Swiss-Prot record:
It comes from the Bacteria. SUPFAM superfamilies: FMN-binding split barrel, UbiD C-terminal domain-like. The gene is ubiD. Keywords: Cell membrane, Decarboxylase, Flavoprotein, FMN, Lyase, Manganese, Membrane, Metal-binding, Ubiquinone biosynthesis. One of its GO terms (biological process) is ubiquinone biosynthetic process. It is a peripheral membrane protein. Catalyzes the decarboxylation of 3-octaprenyl-4-hydroxy benzoate to 2-octaprenylphenol, an intermediate step in ubiquinone biosynthesis. It is an enzyme of class 4 (lyase). The keyword Manganese applies. GO terms for cellular component: cytosol; plasma membrane. It is found in: Cell membrane. Pathway: Cofactor biosynthesis; ubiquinone biosynthesis. Binds 1 prenylated FMN per subunit. This is 3-octaprenyl-4-hydroxybenzoate carboxy-lyase.
Length: 488
């Protein structure tokens, strides 16, 4: 599905009955979480709350509440087509050398398409139709959700944060939650390994006493949001990739108060800065693990300016024990990851991040095993190849006769093909999600790899068991007279 911006996407969802307008008054304080959660768990539509008590803005939730809508946001019609996006990314990340003159020409359309999707810079953008400055800046006028009873304050959840490190031309996009502190202040919660935090660290080293410019987009088009969480190659900007997904170039405009660029069609933009050394305790908040996280200090984001479209839409979500919207997003992106992994490791048959494992903390991989120790190589590959798997705590590797998405198959393989001592790999002192309170040190913990493949000579001295299978001729013969047995 092709679309121009968030409003066009909403209109097309509504025409397909994939979005429901809620005219009954529903509060962003806890109530929207209950409604959104019930609808998501039933596989229901995206929701547009048009009657938000005490606020003038409608609230959009559950935009990516089904895999189908994630696929539509990526310009496709089904989850199956997401594999093609993964193949495109794999080709752009590590293009195969042409096999000849004819093959070189066949690769040109792909390269040309990527180059032609460079962002288009415009002035007079829709997102700057209205400007709040100085005393007009008031974040409390936005219908920011309070998602759970134990949350310390309202929380921006779909803020698309744009930063740029010193001496860099490329801007970084990331999605980081932001706690409301006051009318013009938020807390920017980003992990130290993420792009925005790395830009800020580099800025502090270069300009230790200068303010760090930041822009936050609320209500970007789906392709831009999804590009921010997809492993886009360093040779391609997230905005160019969003253009590829959307089928048209991303329109960007320069912020009024700094040199950063934001989507021209965004609903709301927050412009401001981080002051080196200015931090505040963030949390607790209920998060995607199903628990409240501990309180930690993060930088304070001072908002100098709010710009927005006519009648802006506030885009929000909640996070909690799966399934939630990030978990659904993870299921869809799983299909994008597979071709990327297979490009580098062709022996991988399937790769699965179970949503109940918080979408990234556990991975199951099936391979065509080729030599002793092969499973351990794949474990290391998963942990190191894509930064999205930096926080994956458990990797289970199975043979290709196992269905990676069927726990009965996986547990059977683990309990029949594993010796706990021989087939378990432990790696200590590795990067771990700060939200993982089970790790002994915040941000640092261990990883476990489990080799549930059949063992080859060199891995065992015993005769290995042969799986039981029925004779195919007998199966076909019985199936031929099955209907005559009077059995269902």
């Amino acid at each position: 599905m092709k679309y121009s911006d968030l409003r066009d996407f909403i209109a097309q969802l509504e025409s397909r009955e994939l979005l429901k307008r809620i005219d009954y008054p529903v509060s962003p304080h806890l109530e929207m979480t209950v409604v959104s959660d019930k609808v998501l768990r039933s596989g229901g539509p995206a929701l547009l709350f048009t009657n938000t008590p005490n606020y003038d803005m409608p609230v959009l939730t559950n935009l990516f509440g089904t895999v189908e809508r994630v696929a539509l946001g990526m310009g496709e019609e089904s989850i199956v087509a997401l594999r093609e996006i993964g193949k495109l990314l794999a080709a752009l990340k590590e293009p195969d050398p042409p096999k000849g003159f004819k093959d070189a020409f066949s690769k040109l359309p792909l390269l040309k398409q990527a180059l032609n999707m460079a962002p288009k810079y415009v002035s007079g953008a829709e997102c700057q139709t209205h400007v709040w400055e100085k005393d007009e800046v008031d974040l409390t006028l936005l219908p920011i959700q309070t998602c759970w009873p134990g949350d310390v304050a309202p929380l921006i959840t779909w803020g698309l944060v744009t930063t740029r490190g010193p001496h860099q031309s490329r801007e970084n996009m990331g999605i980081y939650r932001q706690q409301l502190l006051s009318k013009n202040k938020l807390i920017m919660r980003w992990l130290s390994h993420r792009g925005g935090a790395l830009d800020y660290q580099a800025w502090q080293q270069e300009y230790p006493k200068e303010r760090f410019p930041v822009a936050v987009t609320l209500g970007a088009d789906p392709a831009t949001i999804l590009a921010a969480v997809t492993p886009v190659p360093d040779t391609l900007s997230e905005y160019a990739f969003a253009g590829l997904l959307r089928g048209q170039r991303t329109r960007l405009t320069r912020c009024i108060g700094n040199d950063l660029h934001v989507p021209a069609s965004a609903e709301i933009v927050l412009e401001g800065y981080l002051e080196p050394g200015n931090e505040a305790p963030e949390g607790p908040y209920g998060d995607h693990t199903g628990y409240y996280n501990e309180v930690q200090s993060f930088p304070v984001f001072t908002v100098e300016r709010i710009t927005h479209r006519d009648k802006p839409i506030y885009h929000s979500t909640y996070t909690g024990r799966p399934p939630d919207e990030p978990a659904i997003l993870g299921v869809a992106l799983n299909e994008v990851f597979i071709p990327l992994l297979q490009k580098q490791f062709p022996e991988i048959v399937d790769f699965y991040l179970p949503p109940e494992g918080c979408s990234y903390r556990l991975a199951v991989v099936t391979i065509k095993k080729q030599y002793p120790g092969h499973a351990k190589r794949i474990m290391m590959a998963v942990w190191s190849f894509l930064r999205q798997f930096m926080y994956t705590k458990f990797v289970i590797v199975c043979d290709d006769d196992v269905d990676a998405r069927n726990w009965q198959d996986v547990i059977w393989a683990m309990t029949t093909r594993m010796d706990p001592s021989r087939d378990t790999v432990m790696v200590e002192n590795t990067p771990i999600d700060y939200l993982d309170f089970a790790s002994p040190v915040s941000g640092l913990g261990s990883k476990m790899g489990m080799d549930a493949t059949s063992k080859w000579p060199g891995e065992t001295q015993r005769e290995w068991g042969k799986p039981i299978t029925m004779d195919e001729d007998v199966l076909n013969r019985v199936n031929g007279y099955w209907s005559l047995l009077g059995l269902k």
